[in-house]
Amino acid sequence: MDWKGRDVISIRDFSKEDIEFVLKVAERLEEELNEKGSLDYARGKILATLFFEPSTRTRLSFESAMHRLGGSVIGFSSASSTSVKKGESLADTIKTVEQYSDVIVIRHPMEGAARLAAEVAGIPVINAGDGSNQHPTQTLLDLYTIKKAFGKIDGLTIGLLGDLKYGRTVHSLAEALAFYDVELYLISPELLRMPKHIVDELRERGVKVYETTDLEGAIPKLDVLYVTRIQRERFPDEEEYLKVKGSYQVNLEVLKNAKETLKVMHPLPRVDEIHPEVDKTKHALYFRQVFSGVPVRMALLGLTLGVLGV
């Protein structure tokens, strides 16, 4: 398909073939980067990063990706420094920014904000997270990380742990994993279970899904444990948050019954859900996961800008 000008809003907009193509392009770009250090595919192109919510990894990896493609970056990391503070609408902000740039990356607390931005923009829009809804580029780098670690995705048993109700990373990832022959363990407190419509869809698509609150019972079965923090900022009230705060911690004691080959992932930032003692074990994959953001986002930027010649 023609990727030039395409928006990246939801993992639901991707076929399995789309996903595999992005992963293949990312691998090619990673190899080129290792050989050359930097590339010039996007020379003369400008990325605008519009971050209405805090971000470290997503924003910086998109900026790094664009610079490594030879392009440049403008943008903001807080809405408080923009005319949004004066009451400017999101639509007007997008229409303004597109006059200065060739592609937009947006993170916003409102579900559907990225879709709205794509509807009004005449240039590609990439969703870097819209509320508790979707985070498609995180999902693609997660799949890339798993594939690099295991050489495959099919046949794996994957556990998603923590805040499955509000965590946009696990919503997107679960939907993407439905394209593959995997078993999914959804491990969470009762209050933070995966939304029913997502679980129902996974089962309709033939995924074996097991819901449980028992991490220690599930961990011996897992090839991948994908840990998420409790999304404090998404809770309607503090009392509900305090009920589930600190529900799980992955530590050496928990991992003693894990497979030798288990990999622990986390979209980060972490709070206390993975003990630092895990960092030095063979199980820790979360910092390699951070690195994966660069080639995957290079692939998405290059494809939507139409500069890669593929």
UniProtKB/Swiss-Prot annotation:
Species assigned in the record: Thermococcus kodakarensis (strain ATCC BAA-918 / JCM 12380 / KOD1) (Pyrococcus kodakaraensis (strain KOD1))
The residues that hold L-aspartate are K86, R168, R229
Q: Which HAMAP family match?
A: Asp_carb_tr
Pfam family example for this protein? OTCace
- Any idea of its EC number? 2.1.3.2
Annotated SUPFAM superfamilies: Aspartate/ornithine carbamoyltransferase (SSF53671)
| Gene, per the UniProt record | pyrB
Any one GO CC term of this protein is: cytoplasm
Family, according to the entry, reads as follows:
Belongs to the aspartate/ornithine carbamoyltransferase superfamily. ATCase family.
The protein's name in its UniProt record: Aspartate carbamoyltransferase catalytic subunit
Q: Which GO terms describe its biological process?
A: 'de novo' pyrimidine nucleobase biosynthetic process; 'de novo' UMP biosynthetic process; glutamine metabolic process
